[in-house]
A protein has these predicted regions:
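A detector of single, family-specific signature residues
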Residues: 1-421
Length: 421
């Protein structure tokens, strides 16, 4: 179906089984544009507040020309972009580019959870029909009926945080795999070492094994040079005495002197160090972004920049949650419930649905908060005194932390014991 966007032209559109003719006369109260986002192309639909269809179906390519075509089409509808609402689904990285393009042009863009769109579509029709064309139309209709909030500067910061924290999560996961390989290789080439150092993953040990990747090489190393390596990378914690202890142990080691194992060990160590440097760089960026947000949750003792970044990135706008219980459910920290007839289970497990990143961040943050704040530590100990398992007690304490975080974000106030304990 062709359509004309020039002012004064008669425009014919198709709506279900009805054909609607109207004259586009310029200024219209509100324009609603729905975009169904895909990898290579996007389907668009537009209507005004009177229900008149301006674009029945328009497909644009996911490229510069496609974006400009959409911009030119929408711009003709109304001189003021304040009267134009554009909606699209949050489809991960597929929606990022068109979202940034539209916001840079000054449009009010509304990012909608795909679950909301799905529920809305089911509520509008009993037919099991789902097409990109229909989805674009449903999104436009939701802009009229739903109380949605436009993408904002806060949304931008949250989006940036989310991208970085998830990248960090993946890198930490990769580093963990290589640390497992490191442990295996050290067990083969110098198994006695891990008994006399705090961790084989600490910098002093990594740099030592990177230069001397076998017990044989360590046993033959000059004591002065060995001491120099340990002192430099342990920042003075290891001295000549530790160097002597390590060298003597290396001379009695049962470890395998293998060229291939030593080579693999060096490469694994270099990968661990590289991943660590990347994680450190991400942490610097996270600190900058968290400082720009100036969030009150940083006032909670034990909440680090990294923890705050994960929590803020996953929560997004706290006003999307009606209560702390809703936020708890989003984190997947709800207890499961099983009931059948007269039977109700007395023991339940954590649901573990929702954001795994938020759940991980909250549980880790709770451990640190308990170390720094007496109120939280006492609460955890009270649960332990009830003979609850440590992780059950930690889960209860995490729920308390969620209530505190919710209160601080809702009221934009700093943490004060007498108010939130």
């Amino acid at each position: 179906m062709t359509f004309y966007l020039e002012r004064g032209y008669i425009q014919q559109t198709f709506c279900g089984s009805h054909c609607l003719n109207f004259i586009y006369k310029g200024a219209i109260n509100m324009i609603y544009v729905g975009i169904d986002v895909a990898k290579d192309k996007h389907d668009c639909f537009a209507m005004n507040s009177d229900g008149e269809i301006l674009i029945e179906h328009m497909t644009i390519q996911n490229n510069f020309d496609g974006f400009n075509s959409l911009f030119n089409s929408i711009s003709l509808f109304n001189e003021s972009f304040d009267n134009i609402k554009v909606g699209l689904e949050a489809t991960g990285h597929y929606s990022n580019n068109i979202l940034n393009f539209l916001t840079s042009k000054g449009f009010n863009v509304y990012v909608i959870n795909p679950l909301q769109t799905n529920l809305y579509r089911k509520g509008q029709s009993l037919r099991k029909t789902k097409t990109d064309k229909l989805d674009a139309r449903f999104i436009a209709t939701m802009l009229i009926s739903d109380n949605l909030k436009p993408y904002s500067n806060l949304s931008y910061h949250i989006s940036e945080l989310k991208s970085l924290v998830r990248h960090r999560f993946r890198l930490v996961h990769e580093r963990s795999k290589f640390k497992t390989s490191l442990s295996r290789l050290v067990t083969l080439v110098f198994p006695e070492l891990e008994k006399i150092v705090w961790s084989i993953s600490q910098n002093s040990v990594l740099y030592l094994l990177n230069e001397l990747p076998s017990a044989k090489e360590i046993s033959e190393c000059n004591l002065t040079h060995l001491t120099s390596i340990l002192e430099k990378y342990s920042k003075g914690k290891y001295s000549r005495d530790k160097a002597i202890e390590i060298r003597e142990l290396a001379r009695k080691s049962i470890g395998t002197n293998s060229r291939s194992l030593s080579f693999e060990l060096k490469q694994v160590i270099q990968t661990v160090l590289f991943l660590q440097s990347q994680i450190d760089d991400i942490d610097k960026e996270l600190k900058t972004l968290v400082n720009e947000l100036n969030s009150p949750i940083m006032s909670i003792p034990g909440i680090s920049y990294v923890s705050a970044a994960f929590i803020l990135a996953e929560i997004g706008d706290v006003n999307n949650f009606d209560s702390p219980a809703k936020l708890q459910a989003f984190a997947g920290l709800d207890p499961s419930t099983y009931q059948s007839g007269k039977y109700t289970a007395t023991h339940s497990v954590m649901v573990k649905r929702g954001s795994k990143y938020l759940r991980w961040a909250l549980l880790n943050a709770t451990r640190l908060v308990c170390m720094r704040d007496k109120t939280f530590n006492d609460y955890k100990n009270s649960k332990l005194a009830e003979r609850k398992h440590y992780f059950v007690a930690l889960s209860h304490t995490t729920k308390k932390l969620i209530r505190v975080i919710y209160y601080l974000l809702k009221t934009n106030t700093s943490y004060q014991l007498q108010k939130v304990a």
